[in-house]
């Protein structure tokens, strides 16, 4: 995720005239955003059209799917790699590379694709919109992705609270079976592929890929130690790839339109279109598909109607779901919404769930509430997470009141650093990063609150 930037440079030989260089490459894009309607992949994001098979076919789903399957795994993987698609679940790992780990000679064990629809990150609801309004895109994506990695079946693990979404998805799967699009001889390609739905039971930790696999197998949803990785030993001990709903759902469109088309959006290494959730103190909260690398300010003002009270009323933004560090208004002015730009801004794209907070927000209380969430959802398997997040939760509760000393701010920072990177899964990191963002950008607010509490305490003592 924290990939280093590649600095690409070139120079002409001293004796060669520029006009004879023969350089016909197009100039790199410098502006991003304003995605055209014809370039949108998710055409029923707001549920204005029929989400069933008939409506999906009319919008281009399942078009030439048989041809895609017959071109074979290597061709599909090639298009996905050309597209530059990176995982849309948060980590941003190159999808083509990840899927290619499965495309190796079989050792006799079946291979499986597992789709992570256990969307429990606070502020995130992009996958829910796909499941609710465009389920056939996901079912078709399972088929294309499964073909790319030679999988026998797909398991879609859906969050337990998503009752209506699971119902719509099950209807879409049934329609696809009845139309011969999946199952035996899927789409008439000679390729057999099944799709199953597994309901979760409300545990946030099951969004972690190995905990999700454990849950599918009927065990407690606790993350596994890696290695072995799921590509070697996954669900039922078989090679498995776990992928995000959005990642899988865009793959058929990439294959139909071509990887170079998808790569034409966004910056280098941050290509494609992306679903963004915009919530909090905005005039029109929404989920929208936009070009990667769109400026954060443009995203909020164009699609969400701007910050309540105007842009100058903005305090901070959490750009990628609750587990990414917040950024203040000064950073929000110019930052681009992609993996690399947000890493440089000391945060992350995460799930691209933009949580906007205006000046009326008690920023300390808001972050404390997130830490309480992570404390509640920790599985307790790793000591740094089990003890450290609980400790952070108690310290943050005192910070909300101001009942602490300024030196404790550095202690809290140190606690977060001892949790980060020292756990089996990333839940510990997700709890540590919001605290780090708060301290990095709002230390004066913490110190002022502590000073105010101390003065009030002294006044009460003097009065008594």
UniProtKB/Swiss-Prot annotation:
Question: List-wise, which residues carry N6-succinyllysine?
Answer: 81
State which residue ranges cross the membrane. none
- Ligand binding ([4Fe-4S] cluster): 379, 382, 385, 425
Q: What is this protein called?
A: NADH dehydrogenase [ubiquinone] flavoprotein 1, mitochondrial
Q: Which organism is it from?
A: Pan troglodytes (Chimpanzee)
What residues bind FMN, as annotated? 199-247
Cofactor binding note from Swiss-Prot or TrEMBL: Binds 1 FMN. Binds 1 [4Fe-4S] cluster.
Kindly list the GO molecular function terms attached to this UniProt entry. Answer: 4 iron, 4 sulfur cluster binding; FMN binding; metal ion binding; NAD binding; NADH dehydrogenase (ubiquinone) activity
Biological processes annotated in GO = mitochondrial electron transport, NADH to ubiquinone
This protein's cofactor list reads: FMN; [4Fe-4S] cluster
Task: List the EC numbers from the record.
Answer: 7.1.1.2
Compartments in which it is found = Mitochondrion inner membrane
Pfam families linked: Complex1_51K, NADH_4Fe-4S, SLBB_2
Range annotated as the organelle transit peptide: 1-20
Taken from the UniProt entry, a GO cellular component term is: respiratory chain complex I
Q: PTM Omega-N-methylarginine: at which residues?
A: 257
